[in-house]
Amino acid sequence: MNYHEHFDVIVIGGGHAGTEAAAAAARMGMNTLLLTHNIETLGQMSCNPAIGGIGKGHLVREIDALGGLMANAADKAGIQFRILNGSKGPAVRATRAQADRLLYKAAIREKLENQENLKIFQQEVEDLVVENDRVSGVVTKMGIKFSAKTVVLTVGTFLNGQIHVGLKNHSGGRAGDSASIGLAQRLRELPLRTGRLKTGTPARIDSRSIDFSALEVQHGDNPTPVFSFLGDRSEHPRQIPCYITHTNEKTHDIIRRNLDRSPMYSGVIEGVGPRYCPSIEDKVMRFADKNSHQIFVEPEGLTTNEIYPNGISTSLPFDVQIDFIRSMKGFENAFVTRPGYAIEYDYFDPRDLKSTLESKYIDGLFFAGQINGTTGYEEAAAQGLLAGMNAGLMVQDKEGWCPGRDQAYAGVLVDDLSTLGTKEPYRMFTSRAEYRLLLREDNADTRLTEKGRELGLVDDIRWKAFSMKQESVETEIQRLKNQWIHPKSENASQINALLKTPMQRESTLEGMIRRPEVNYQSLISIEGLGPVLENVQAAEQVEIIIKYQGYVDRQREEIEKLKRNEDTLLPIHLDYSDIKGLSNEVTAKLNDTKPENIGQASRISGITPAAISILLIYIKKNALRRKVL
């Protein structure tokens, strides 16, 4: 049957990509339909119960700056918050929240069910309607045909999903859910390159069977950070600790003895797994010199006894899982509530996508999330928001948009995928961004919220809060530039107590904050120098802007220089091993890819700004011109 209502945007899948895509399109005023196989699992955390981390926390803040859902849900569900790399520079500091699965899922669902212009329908999709290389709708398992101007595919690990525990396997999208077979077959009929990837999850353990007195306790930060720019600590539920244990030689021996029963090492699994989240089998074999690996013992929520042992993802047989788990300190009597497993699934080559995440070959069809070869909730959510937004822009006959590599980690993510593709599950790290000093967590709103407002993603409440914060930051920086302090002033002794060497001459407050040993809070708290900004995020941004302005300015100059040189052609026969100063990794990647110009070279993952500068000098010095074959 044909459904009576025509939609602007249809989103297939209700995971982290799908929920952000549907919400983004609806915020823009698009008549949006979210199709999911089960409304109860909207926003479900299928693997680890955590949001954020190095590189990932930056994505969460960017999603929030564009009006997305993830940061707000993490604030409402976070049962432990930590700032990672807190002792390092602001570019690599990252927020991470241990989350209550049920609270997170409930927060996402509440947002979706109260979002204007969004309808949710529970039904599995089996077919796409494609006419003259343009998508025009979808068909569900019941034969219901929904028509739409655009369709966003966010089907995660469900396409031809195959779950492995030991040498036994069965069809499934994740534990407890069936795989999407019909849609997978239909997509393989389209002119799209496809492949197989693999991911995995550890066994879950009943906390009542763990001896926590034998484990190292890990408390969260106090005061707790917040993820959302509109967030408040009062939204956080009760905070609880995590714990740490370790594998040992006995653990490793059990695993090594049973590798012939592993689907990964017996050749049953052909898909490539995530490099930066390896299974315990992989860790034992790849790092044979290590006799121990750290395992984080993470609660799954406030109302459950289940524990997520982060670091022992596995697809070994169930009996082997029990044996190696019980070999670890504190886990001698562990009761496993769910076995760990690996899952293989179809993904589609993201090089077949435009930077808007629309297919190059089928108009109006967008891809986001693990279907593009990524791994992680945050990577999926960022893609989902951009895909949903661009679907909305297409409906309005407006030009698509994707942030540049110098604007957002989301831009780095999409550029890496659409330019280079991936042969293994792609995870975001701060090291993937050339301009990470510009792409900090604290300034995600400064970078993106104004654009989000222009695109229709940002509502009045967020825009007002952002505008007030920006005004207070600018006003405070100007005040700090204009207010002078003198070596003989009344509060000089208090000021000198903050300094390594006493003041010798007068200085502005801005000049004092530039000193490495002085921070904004302690200086402005001195009588006569305040008041301190009440907005904690604004105060943090004031200090970072002042302390790092010189570095930021130099990086912006570097960006402008590189942009001017993007079209500089590179000789097709150039042997990059002849160029002194390039690392072996950079040389190998350039010789393998043979970029046509500096712009393409700069977008190869791992090619640093320093390497690009060396290339430019070499080209100029040798007056090289690209030879055409």
UniProtKB/Swiss-Prot annotation:
Positions annotated to bind NAD(+): 273-287
Electron transport in keyword set: no
Binding site residues for FAD: 13-18, 125, 180, 370
Essential cofactor(s): FAD
Subcellular location: Cytoplasm
A molecular function (GO) term: flavin adenine dinucleotide binding
Source organism superkingdom: Bacteria
Keyword tRNA processing: yes
Matches recorded under InterPro entries: FAD/NAD-bd_sf, GIDA_C_N, MnmG, MnmG-rel, MnmG-rel_CS, MnmG_C, MnmG_C_subdom, MnmG_C_subdom_sf
Family annotation (SUPFAM superfamilies): FAD/NAD(P)-binding domain
Stated role: NAD-binding protein involved in the addition of a carboxymethylaminomethyl (cmnm) group at the wobble position (U34) of certain tRNAs, forming tRNA-cmnm(5)s(2)U34.
Assigned protein family: Belongs to the MnmG family.
Name of the protein this chain belongs to: tRNA uridine 5-carboxymethylaminomethyl modification enzyme MnmG
Lineage: Bacteria, Pseudomonadati, Pseudomonadota, Gammaproteobacteria, Alteromonadales
